[in-house]
């Protein structure tokens, strides 16, 4: 006979998927709303020749309907961009931007969604080498330079982007989250707003030192 404790454990295990589904529901800003102008998303590929030479990556550019090509747009950069730009997954950033810009709750903003780089295989049938941790977890100004010297100038050739650091934001999750912080920490003169989803402030590549580093920095 199953004792009561075992029965309770079984009930909780069976109920866990249902509880998880009920734990969070997307709000209206994450849903396409009738009458809200929809921005456009285009996909591109970037081969780095300067900061991360030899790496290739996909990236996406979101341009809101309200962008007029004359007024400089605010900018927000996302690491692991394929996750954030996908309107069928949880973040749905293009949809959220559509709704918030339409309501006047955020400025006209161009979104840049970057996947981490990979190094293509040198032999047929080989697998690409992922560069994510090196790019995201390293505590240096290298990734900030990548954005400022490669990506933003390239996007800036197509769209008019603001130079105001207060109108530039960067975000990411996990290693992409600590990467976002590091960019703003290294270059506060270029990025002033950070969205870090459960950033990996652990000793992957030294991120655990940030609390002490912040305390000691004037």
Question: Whereabouts are the PLM-identified features?
Answer:
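Short, linear, compositionally biased motifs with a strong N-terminal bias
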Residues: 11-12
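Cleavable N-terminal signal peptides
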Residues: 7-8, 18
């Amino acid at each position: 006979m199953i004792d009561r404790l075992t029965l309770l454990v079984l009930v909780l295990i069976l109920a866990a998927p249902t509880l998880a589904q009920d734990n969070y529901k997307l709000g209206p800003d994450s849903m396409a709303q009738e009458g809200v102008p929809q921005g456009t998303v285009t996909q591109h590929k970037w081969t780095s020749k300067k900061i991360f030479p030899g790496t290739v990556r996909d990236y996406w550019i979101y341009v809101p309907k309200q962008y007029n090509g004359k007024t400089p747009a605010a900018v927000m950069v996302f690491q692991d961009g394929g996750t954030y730009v996908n309107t069928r997954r949880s973040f749905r950033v293009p949809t959220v931007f559509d709704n918030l810009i339409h309501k006047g709750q955020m400025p006209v903003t161009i979104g840049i969604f970057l996947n981490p780089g990979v190094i293509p295989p040198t032999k047929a049938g080989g697998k690409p080498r992922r560069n994510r941790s090196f790019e995201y977890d390293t505590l240096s100004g290298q990734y900030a330079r990548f954005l400022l010297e490669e990506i933003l100038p390239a996007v800036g050739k197509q769209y008019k982007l603001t130079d105001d650091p207060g109108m530039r934001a960067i975000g990411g999750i996990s290693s992409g989250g600590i990467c976002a912080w590091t960019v703003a920490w290294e270059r506060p003169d270029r990025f002033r707003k950070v969205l870090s989803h459960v950033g990996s402030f652990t000793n992957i590549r030294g991120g655990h030192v940030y609390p002490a580093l912040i305390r000691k920095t004037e």
